[in-house]
Amino acid sequence: QANDYKANADEFAGQLKDLDKKADSFTDSHKDVHALATEPVAGYLLQEMGIEDSTPEEFVTQSETDAGPSTKTVADTKALLSGKKVQLLVVNGQTTDAITDQLRSTAKTAGIPEVGVTETLPEGVDTYADFIGSTIDKISTTVK
């Protein structure tokens, strides 16, 4: 049994190295990319890919409250999209609301592409490596 654990751990470590290479490839070919996220679900992955998460801290903090972000905070956040200060909108498709819809609409009007992410493995994806790999692929094909 110990050999099985070791073999599985080695296989997983190899998959993680492949993911690092995939993320590094994006970083090498895309400089100064900024994203806005409806939720901080993909924050570590964006960082690993060299993408600056430009989501205002107030938006993140206020989004976690029952009241949600203030009108000013939403306006400031939308201004990042309409002013083309970011190149990507990252949307957690598992939790959307009216503010998410506003951000998506603003991004679409501004020509800012959107990529969907999830907090859990989507249907048809069985492994962590496939989950993260497919997210890297989606971001890579979305950001020009």
Predicted region positions:
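Extracytoplasmic metal-acquisition and chelation regions
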Residues: 1-144
